[in-house]
Amino acid sequence: MLENLCTLPLSADLFTQVLHPSEPLLTVGLASGKVETFRLPNDDDEEDESGRRTSTSSGRGMIKSIWSTRRHKGSCRHLAYSHDGSAMYSAGTDSVVKHFSPETGNVISKIGLPPRNSATSTTDCPAILHVLSPQTLLLGTDSGGLYIFDLRENGSLNPKPVRKHVPHADYISSITPLPASAESTSGFPKQWVSTGGTTLAVTDLRHGIVATSEDQEDELLCSTIIPTGLGPKKMRSNAVVAVGTGNGILTLWDRGAWDDQQERINVAGGRTKKDGESLDAIVRVPDELGWGKKVIVGVGDGSLSIVDLKRREVQFVLKHDEVEGVSALTFDYQNRLISGGGRTVKVWAESGDDDLDEEEEEEAEATGFKRPARSDSDSDDDSEDERPQKSSNKKQKKGKGNQARSVAFPGLD
């Protein structure tokens, strides 16, 4: 179903990765505070220097470092692109949010987070960023706070947040926008689902927190939305949100019924809660691949589980790493899967063998490839040397900057 095209080594543990919406650009944020952008092989790059055609149409070629810098004094916790890809934002443990150019990495503007509350001068630590629309950026924090910032015409952040809500009692682990209603004139979301600690919440841009779930008695770590096709009977067009938990269970939530989960899929659970592996990252498989209603889940044991949401089962298991868990999953605009965790990023593409016959399925099960479901100082000097640091990111309990480097894909002459 998927084959690994390339493994990209990193200089420190990965905290976050993000892909340009329309260009083959991958940016990573590391525990050392370093941010680096790579150019992935592109279908348009059809000839090499000697004029020979390369195999980039299948996603093979060279990954090249475009720029690198120490963006934050502490770790880089999260990255986000603007909707059109013209601007990027980073947030670090230094409680600073920076707006910079994706092509050069040059900082255009920056802001510091306000104090956590009126009773203290201590600033909160950012945990996650999400650009909701061309005018709005959301920032979730370690304390469960959620700030709403206005974006100016050039993408710069207004220094003061427009609003602050506190939907969770613990750090915000994911933000998933809900599709705009049919009556929307802009087409951009006005509501979003967030997870933090052991609860799920829904927040409205204008009206604040509109729903909070019951205590799930398990950490909710990641989420994604399936817009149609999985809702209850006679409501198949209703959206469903898939949420990964700390004990290896993938839970499904019907839009509008936010008090509790409706379905459970055992992805990496054990006999007890302590035995399960955490589900730290999730991504919906693009419709263009024609796989049906599936998600790929990054697991704390370093595996990638491909989950069929209609059958409520794990169909295939791949391996990102033997030791480190998978902390980030994204599909690029060419529908290649990018998995990240530990000190490696991997690029995956369809192998061409989408349909296994019965004999192949038996062989896959015998080798363990297929697993059935179970029951239940602001330094932007590109020449600065980097030294990996220990991470303070709660989700990870479990050379020189400007020199270009590249990694070859296999299969080239």
Swiss-Prot record:
Name the source's superkingdom.
Eukaryota
Q: Where in the cell is it found?
A: Nucleus, Nucleolus
Q: Which InterPro entries match?
A: WD40/YVTN_repeat-like_dom_sf, WD40_repeat_dom_sf, WD40_rpt, WDR55_POC1
Gene3D superfamilies, per the entry: YVTN repeat-like/Quinoprotein amine dehydrogenase (2.130.10.10)
Q: Which UniProt keywords apply?
A: Nucleus, Repeat, WD repeat
Keyword check for Repeat, yes or no: yes
What stretches of residues are WD repeats? 30-70, 71-110, 120-159, 220-263, 277-317, 321-358
Q: Please name the SUPFAM superfamilies in this protein's record.
A: WD40 repeat-like
Q: Where is the composition biased (Acidic residues)?
A: 353-365
GO CC terms: nucleolus
Q: Give the start-end ranges of region Disordered.
A: 39-61, 353-413
Which PANTHER family does the record cross-reference, listed alphabetically?
WD REPEAT-CONTAINING PROTEIN 55
> In which family does this protein belong, per the annotation?
Belongs to the WD repeat WDR55 family.
- UniProt protein name: WD repeat-containing protein JIP5
Organism of origin is Podospora anserina (strain S / ATCC MYA-4624 / DSM 980 / FGSC 10383) (Pleurage anserina)
Name of the coding gene = JIP5
